[in-house]
């Protein structure tokens, strides 16, 4: 096995004495830093490489701290108006994962960079910590490489805002196989609309 395989096995056993100590110390360290800061290198190089990171110019790592827990509906004095079924304020669950929220915040902060992917690095009772891989699309090392030219195209601007990253696609219900029939046609809304629209074809 190569070195990265050993690192992968270490991270799989998070309850081991070594990892429990490491994660605890790192969480303390991350709490002292600002909620969004640049990391000098990936904490998990094996995971970062699997997600597309390369230790070369043009690649940047940002570490994000996201507060855990559900979402409270932002309404003044709890006045939601409308029917009682929609009166909920406190026990609202956000549709997207905290990882996709972290990607969005990194993308907003670094508007000139493109979000490639992200991964979990730790959590405690209050926060979750993620590292986001960003790419500088104007760097020659990125533009001249056939493997990374795709992300330099304008259609990939703020892909994290539109649910095009791996974490963003999870909450959209996209995938292959019989478990993902609700999103045939691109989205849940498209699938629902097609099934609930009466189409009377001319020849039948």
Swiss-Prot record:
Presence of the UniProt keyword Ribonucleoprotein in the record: yes
Molecular function GO terms recorded: RNA binding; structural constituent of ribosome
Location in the cell: Cytoplasm
PROSITE patterns: RIBOSOMAL_L15E
Any Gene Ontology CC annotation: cytosolic large ribosomal subunit
InterPro entries assigned: Rbsml_eL15_core_dom_sf (IPR024794), Ribosomal_eL15 (IPR000439), Ribosomal_eL15_CS (IPR020925), Ribosomal_uL23/eL15/eS24_sf (IPR012678)
Family to which this protein belongs: Belongs to the eukaryotic ribosomal protein eL15 family.
Species of provenance: Ctenopharyngodon idella
Alphabetized PANTHER family for the sequence: LARGE RIBOSOMAL SUBUNIT PROTEIN EL15, RIBOSOMAL PROTEIN L15
Protein name: Large ribosomal subunit protein eL15
Top-level taxon of the source organism: Eukaryota
Pfam families: Ribosomal_L15e (PF00827)
Record text on subunit structure and interactions: Component of the large ribosomal subunit.
Keywords assigned: Cytoplasm, Ribonucleoprotein, Ribosomal protein
Function, as annotated: Component of the large ribosomal subunit. The ribosome is a large ribonucleoprotein complex responsible for the synthesis of proteins in the cell.
Biological process terms in GO annotation: cytoplasmic translation
């Amino acid at each position: 096995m190569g070195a990265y395989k050993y690192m992968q096995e270490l991270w799989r056993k998070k309850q081991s004495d070594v990892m429990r100590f490491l994660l605890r110390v790192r969480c303390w360290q991350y709490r002292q830093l600002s909620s969004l800061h640049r990391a000098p290198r990936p904490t998990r190089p094996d995971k970062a490489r699997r997600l597309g990171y390369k230790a070369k110019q043009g690649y940047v790592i940002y570490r994000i701290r996201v507060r855990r827990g559900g979402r409270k509906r932002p309404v003044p004095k709890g006045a939601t108006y409308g029917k009682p079924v929609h009166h909920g304020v406190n026990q609202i669950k956000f549709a997207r994962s905290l990882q996709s929220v972290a990607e969005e915040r990194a993308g907003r902060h670094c508007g000139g960079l493109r979000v490639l992917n992200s991964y979990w690095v730790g959590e405690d009772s209050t926060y979750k910590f993620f590292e986001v891989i960003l790419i500088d699309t104007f760097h020659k090392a990125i533009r001249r490489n056939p493997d990374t030219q795709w992300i330099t195209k304008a259609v990939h601007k703020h892909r994290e805002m539109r649910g095009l990253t791996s974490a963003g696609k999870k909450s959209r219900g996209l995938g292959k196989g019989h478990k993902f029939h609700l999103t045939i046609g691109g989205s849940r809304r498209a699938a629902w609309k097609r099934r609930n629209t009466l189409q009377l074809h001319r020849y039948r």
